[in-house]
Amino acid sequence: MHGWRRARLTERTKQTATGRTLTFEVPHWPGHLPGQHVDVRLTADDGYQAVRSYSLAAPADAGGDRIELGVQAAFGGEVSPYLADDLPVGAEVEVMGPLGGWFVWTPQDHGPLLLIAGGSGVVPVMAMLRARAASASGDPCTLLYSVRAPDEVWYATELDAATEGVRVRLLYTRTAPEGSRRPAGRITTDDLLGMPPPTDTRCYVCGPTAFVEHVGELLLAAGYGPDRIRTERFG
């Protein structure tokens, strides 16, 4: 890992009312693994600096200098609302990374894959799904994605068109769409029924702290060993 690098914003994509995907060009980017993140540093005209961490949403381009970050604008936040809506395309920030070596998955990690995400916690999980699709892995993969309402789903179009071998299940905690067979509510043991067996499945859980702790307890109770569960939390 090197120090701070200049990163130029090249594209902003709306995911939800407050969620954005930001694409940056980072000269001499060293590459990264699915699940890793970066630190982003902003410097004001008076020299004041603020640093925040954001997950990488896509696997590394082969020899490319492009990175894609997911940013959820936090109400009253100092940095995320500015990045989400106000940083001009063409402007530069600084990034450090890639960071993190625990919450990562690569196509060499064979076996069934169970991904569980809450809200914007789907961002690093999306990098894993995209890397899996690019590798043409034949191992089964399941995504359980918990959001408050249908309009808070990140990457909705891409998830609707999930590739063969990927099962996507959306879980709504506050407002379920009309016709949904599952009532709105937090994830429960019943939601884990029919998931890949605990014996050889790799589990990745990402989301707010309370969500991750709750899901971790459910997985352990369902027989998934602690050595098979990797977590990333925020908030």
Q: Which residue ranges define each predicted feature?
A:
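Ferredoxin-reductase
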Residues: 1-91, 147-149, 172-175
